[in-house]
Amino acid sequence: MFIKFLSIFLLFSFSHISFAQDITGVWQSVDDLTGAPKGQVEITQESDGTYTGKITKITPRTGYTPKEFCINCPAPYANKPILGLNVITKLKHKKDLLYTGGKILDPNSGRVYSLTAKLSNNGQRLHLRGYVGVSVLGRSQIWIRVN
């Protein structure tokens, strides 16, 4: 009886590990003001355990002509092609579905923000919060996983 109980307990205790997802993969970025798709970002894990996100696709939108280069961006992003640009850097997994300590670049404005991210329970949405100083002074976006 004890072995049966222990087996069931261990099964449920470790089941979340087998279903755990991380943020690696391709994500559709969505304009937080209009809801229109902006492009795709591929998030990969670096050898030091941090996560980096690179623009892999720019989605054409009515009334918007995307920039080809990161004109107003600080070094090391200045005058680099936007396609292939690392817009997320140094993001670290903190616990469970939470990621912190990263930086995110807005290639349209050239501004770099501190970044936190939280993966949804089903792993299909990534809630990003870019901010300066404190998280209250920031902006949020929800990205959708591309399958």
Segments the model singles out, each with a brief description of its role:
Residues 1-6:
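Bacterial N-terminal signal peptides that target proteins for export
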Residues 7-8, 18:
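Cleavable N-terminal signal peptides
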Residues 14-20:
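Sec/Tat signal peptide C-region and signal peptidase I cleavage site
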Residues 20-28:
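Cleaved targeting-peptide boundary
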Residues 29-115:
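Central antiparallel beta-sheet cores of small beta-barrel/beta-sandwich binding domains
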Residues 73-79, 127-134:
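Short aromatic-glycine motifs in intrinsically disordered, low-complexity regions
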Residues 112-119, 125-126, 131:
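C-terminal terminal-subdomain/extension
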Residues 123-125, 131-147:
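Edge beta-strand at a domain terminus
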